Amino acid sequence: MAIVLPQGRFNNSTDRYIRNFIAERCRILAVVGLHCNTFKPHTGPKTSVLFVQKWDDELCPKVDNYNIFFATQRLEGKNNSGDKLYWIKCGNGTTTDPKDAKCDIYGHPIVYHDLFATVDYDCGDGKVNKKIQQTADGIAEAFIEFAKKEKLSFFR
């Protein structure tokens, strides 16, 4: 399960009871800090995504000491006005104009972020013939490696 929370819920001493409540019931898998522009223009507070897995005797046995994945989004995805940023077609940089943006194989402009890699697959005959990576690996790919290393139940 994933929950988007204001950053203060992770840091404020007065919110310790919330953190304790969650930790008693779930394994904290990851905390991913989102860029402050993520929810603009509608809201501006810094937020993070908390990923948890409910304690379960079979799938997620309770342990007292375990590793947690931490990451921070560095590529904003939106500018200060809340307009989406796209990877520019040629060269490095960004644009707010989808017409000038790098696109995936379906013609969708690729948003400028580092949450996950944008990968196109050539599946002409129903099988993957070729994998074309449009953007670098991101936070999701790093989490997958972490989950495999930690032998989490959903990546065994």
Protein language model features and the residues they cover:
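A conserved structural/catalytic subdomain of Rossmann-like adenosyl-cofactor enzymes
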Residues: 2-156
